[in-house]
């Protein structure tokens, strides 16, 4: 089962949290579509800023957005000009008060989405797929990962038939729920069509927080 299911979704509620933190009964569909518009807009606007995750929280007419990026300076801009411009654009997009929080990713080589995007960018620039994958694996392991698995699928090197190539190093325990595994899937747009790049990074074990016993540990 662990080999098939999305590793992030499998661990939600155990060691991972939701990327959207809000609840709505009647407006659920409209809020969900608004979330999708926000994420799509941020990803297109900050395509070169190495954005990994966008977390959205809602409270009444206020939307709190946390942008996890490896290049916070590019997102914030000189004197905060760029982030203020982005906030105003999201205000107009949603019709609500938007607050933006920038979270810096200290080790981008341990982030599955950023590693996958790096491989995809090299594939689009006609770098040999084996070289791109092996270099990414070496950088990730040097950054302190316990294991990594990378998979590229499609018309590799312009071959007539599509195929799947995988490389891995270290251990990636997909069945262990306390294992902190970061997963991503990105696309590379080449002259021969699209290539799918999947990345699994094992960053060590995380023990779930124990709930305090209301009876004083008895």
Curated annotation (Swiss-Prot):
CDD domains: KH-II_30S_S3 (cd02412)
Region forming the signal peptide: none
Domain of life, per lineage: Bacteria
Domain KH type-2 residue range list: 38-106
InterPro entries attached to this UniProt entry: KH_dom, KH_dom-like_a/b, KH_dom_type_2, KH_sf_prok-type, Ribosomal_S3_C_sf, Ribosomal_uS3_bac-typ, Ribosomal_uS3_C, Ribosomal_uS3_CS
Entry keywords, A to Z: Ribonucleoprotein, Ribosomal protein, RNA-binding, rRNA-binding
A Gene Ontology term for the protein's cellular component: cytosolic small ribosomal subunit
Keyword hit for Glycoprotein: no
GO molecular function annotation: mRNA binding; rRNA binding; structural constituent of ribosome
Pfam families: KH_2, Ribosomal_S3_C
GO biological process entries: translation
Assigned protein family: Belongs to the universal ribosomal protein uS3 family.
PANTHER family linked to this entry: 30S/40S RIBOSOMAL PROTEIN S3 (PTHR11760), SMALL RIBOSOMAL SUBUNIT PROTEIN US3C (PTHR11760:SF19)
Subunit field text: Part of the 30S ribosomal subunit. Forms a tight complex with proteins S10 and S14.
Protein purpose: Binds the lower part of the 30S subunit head. Binds mRNA in the 70S ribosome, positioning it for translation.
Record-given protein name: Small ribosomal subunit protein uS3
Organism listed in the record: Ligilactobacillus salivarius (strain UCC118) (Lactobacillus salivarius)
Chain's gene name: rpsC
């Amino acid at each position: 089962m662990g080999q098939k299911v999305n590793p992030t979704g499998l661990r939600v509620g155990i060691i991972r949290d939701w990327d959207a933190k809000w609840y709505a009964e009647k407006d659920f569909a409209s809020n969900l579509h608004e979330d999708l518009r926000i994420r799509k807009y941020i990803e297109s606007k900050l395509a070169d800023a190495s954005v990994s995750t966008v977390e959205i929280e809602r409270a009444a007419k206020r939307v709190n957005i946390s942008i996890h990026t490896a290049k916070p300076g590019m997102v914030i801009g000189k004197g905060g000009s760029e982030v203020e411009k982005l906030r105003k654009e999201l205000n107009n997009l949603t019709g609500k008060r938007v607050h933006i929080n920038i979270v810096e990713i200290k080790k981008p080589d341990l982030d599955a989405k950023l590693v996958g995007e790096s491989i995809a960018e090299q594939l689009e620039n006609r770098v040999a797929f084996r070289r791109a994958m092996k270099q990414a694996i070496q950088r990730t392991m040097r950054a302190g990962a316990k294991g990594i698995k990378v998979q590229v699928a499609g018309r590799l090197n312009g071959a007539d038939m599509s195929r799947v190539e995988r490389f891995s190093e270290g251990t990636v325990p997909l069945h262990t729920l306390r294992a902190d595994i970061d997963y991503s899937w990105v696309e590379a747009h080449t002259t021969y069509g699209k290539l799918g790049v999947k990345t699994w990074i094992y960053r060590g074990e995380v023990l779930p927080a124990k709930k305090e016993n209301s009876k004083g540990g008895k």
